[in-house]
């Protein structure tokens, strides 16, 4: 038997990126031999083992043959005669089909090193089209390595388009679609993930609510980029520069879904789009099993982003109600997350990429002042039951209003 380090660990070492997981392939062995050596078998569909000491994954070299639909419709052959090259042949991209032996010698039958140097994501073989999950994986790699200059080979993008048009994507489970999306949201350039899906015609299948935004115009005065789909990807890009919080990034992606519902005769204006988008977001999140934490922030951002943009025009009472509705007294981080999305929304427009967002500082100070209003003095003054909350809201609004007057006066002086 011979053991090789394969896949991401080899690729990331060559890219001088941090290696997170190490996966090994074992050539010329069997299930019986691995168990006899103390390895623990964990793979049900194909023989994968955990090392008795390191707990790292070791898989027997195998070939795969498509037997059904989706990414699970495969039969595997892991007999002793399967070669290293045969195992590498079943992998998705050439950059993931490089192996390294115990002496550091590389085996690269499909020229993955050349593609790493050329910064190209290229499929290993035409068997690429047998696994629809690869559309999402390649889009995710494009997002992950975009900052390094990687692009997808045109012929690979064509195969991804073929998969999207074949109906195979319909066989992906919602959980797996979300898993890949969630990983993409943690990448350095998550907007590239959705851009690639749009290019290969997979976005309309997997995320039709986002795809519907493309071709919907906005007022050029406020949106020089005009197209709502383009704006959405710009917002995701800018928000990702401001925060690595995946829930914040997801909320940025879906904040304008309501604009797709605007009747054409009302274009390019989109009255009430934030509220119109709420049922669309709920439906999307239910379909692909988005975590509640992500969903709740997304709903808040869609519902309130116009109010946040208009913060300086809001009455103090309205600001207190906004803080109540967002449950910010118990979850102050939610206000920060909402403001990050809104800042990204402002910057996600052609020519506004460096813009500051004074609304955030203003509302955070309003919140700080309102949080410090003393409820004990209200109780001591004799208020009881529901009167306490009503008076607390009045006192908070008064405190915010006093600050608002000072803020406006200070700006007028400058």
From Swiss-Prot:
Q: Name one GO biological process term.
A: RNA repair
> What cofactor is needed?
Mg(2+); Ni(2+)
Residues at which CTP binds: 8, 11, 91, 137, 140
Alphabetized, the UniProt keywords read:
ATP-binding, Hydrolase, Magnesium, Metal-binding, Multifunctional enzyme, Nickel, Nucleotide-binding, Nucleotidyltransferase, RNA repair, RNA-binding, Transferase, tRNA processing
Question: Gene3D superfamilies given for it?
Answer: Beta Polymerase, domain 2, cca-adding enzyme, domain 2
UniProt-annotated binding residues for Mg(2+) = 21, 23
State the EC number(s).
2.7.7.72, 3.1.3.-, 3.1.4.-
GO MF entries? ATP binding; CCA tRNA nucleotidyltransferase activity; cyclic-nucleotide phosphodiesterase activity; magnesium ion binding; phosphatase activity; tRNA binding
Where ATP binds, per the record, is at: 8, 11, 91, 137, 140
Give start and end of each HD domain: 228-329
Which reaction is this enzyme known to catalyze?
Answer: a tRNA precursor + 2 CTP + ATP = a tRNA with a 3' CCA end + 3 diphosphate; a tRNA with a 3' CCA end + 2 CTP + ATP = a tRNA with a 3' CCACCA end + 3 diphosphate
Per UniProt, the cofactor note for this protein states: Magnesium is required for nucleotidyltransferase activity. Nickel for phosphatase activity.
Q: Which protein family is it in?
A: Belongs to the tRNA nucleotidyltransferase/poly(A) polymerase family. Bacterial CCA-adding enzyme type 1 subfamily.
Q: What is known of its domains?
A: Comprises two domains: an N-terminal domain containing the nucleotidyltransferase activity and a C-terminal HD domain associated with both phosphodiesterase and phosphatase activities.
Assembly mode: Monomer. Can also form homodimers and oligomers.
Its function, per the record, reads: Catalyzes the addition and repair of the essential 3'-terminal CCA sequence in tRNAs without using a nucleic acid template. Adds these three nucleotides in the order of C, C, and A to the tRNA nucleotide-73, using CTP and ATP as substrates and producing inorganic pyrophosphate. tRNA 3'-terminal CCA addition is required both for tRNA processing and repair. Also involved in tRNA surveillance by mediating tandem CCA addition to generate a CCACCA at the 3' terminus of unstable tRNAs. While stable tRNAs receive only 3'-terminal CCA, unstable tRNAs are marked with CCACCA and rapidly degraded.
Give the free-text miscellaneous remark of the entry: A single active site specifically recognizes both ATP and CTP and is responsible for their addition.
Q: What is this protein called?
A: Multifunctional CCA protein
Taxonomy of the source species: Bacteria, Pseudomonadati, Pseudomonadota, Gammaproteobacteria, Alteromonadales
């Amino acid at each position: 038997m011979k053991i090789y380090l394969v896949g991401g660990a080899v690729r990331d070492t060559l890219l001088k990126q941090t290696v997170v997981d190490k996966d090994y392939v074992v050539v010329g062995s069997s299930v019986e031999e691995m168990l006899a050596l103390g390895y623990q078998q964990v793979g049900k569909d194909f023989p994968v083992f955990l090392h008795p000491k390191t707990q790292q994954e070791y898989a027997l070299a195998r070939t795969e043959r498509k037997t059904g639909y989706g990414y699970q419709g495969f039969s595997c052959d892991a007999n002793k005669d399967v070669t290293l090259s045969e195992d590498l042949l079943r992998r998705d991209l050439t950059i993931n089909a490089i192996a390294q032996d115990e002496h550091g010698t590389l085996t690269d039958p499909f020229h993955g090193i050349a593609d790493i140097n050329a910064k190209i994501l290229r499929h290993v073989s035409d068997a690429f089209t047998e696994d629809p999950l690869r559309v999402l994986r390649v889009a995710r790699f494009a997002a992950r390595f975009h900052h390094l200059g990687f692009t997808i080979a045109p012929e690979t993008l064509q195969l991804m388009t073929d998969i999207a048009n074949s109906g195979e994507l319909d066989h992906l489970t919602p959980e797996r679609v979300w898993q890949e999306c969630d990983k993409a949201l943690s990448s350095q350039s998550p907007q590239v993930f959705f851009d690639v899906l749009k290019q290969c015609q997979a976005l309309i299948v997997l995320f039709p609510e986002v795809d519907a935004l493309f071709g919907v115009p906005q007022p050029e005065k406020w949106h020089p980029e005009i197209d709502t789909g383009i704006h959405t990807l710009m917002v995701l890009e800018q928000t990702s520069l401001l925060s690595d919080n995946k829930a914040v990034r997801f909320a940025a992606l879906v904040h304008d879904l309501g604009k797709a519902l605007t009747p054409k005769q009302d274009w390019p204006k989109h009255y009430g789009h934030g509220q119109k988008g709420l049922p669309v977001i709920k439906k999307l999140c239910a379909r692909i099993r988005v975590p509640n934490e992500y969903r709740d922030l997304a709903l808040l951002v869609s519902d309130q982003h116009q109010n946040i943009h208009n913060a300086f025009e809001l009455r103090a009472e309205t600001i207190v109600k906004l803080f109540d509705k967002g449950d910010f007294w118990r979850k102050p981080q939610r206000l920060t997350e909402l403001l990050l999305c809104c800042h990204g929304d402002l910057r996600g427009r052609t020519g506004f990429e460096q813009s500051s967002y004074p609304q955030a500082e203003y509302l955070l100070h309003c919140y700080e002042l309102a949080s410090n209003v003393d409820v004990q003095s209200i109780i001591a003054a004799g208020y009881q039951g529901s009167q306490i909350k009503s008076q607390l809201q009045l006192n908070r609004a008064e405190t915010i209003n006093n600050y608002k007057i000072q803020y406006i006066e200070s700006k007028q002086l400058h």
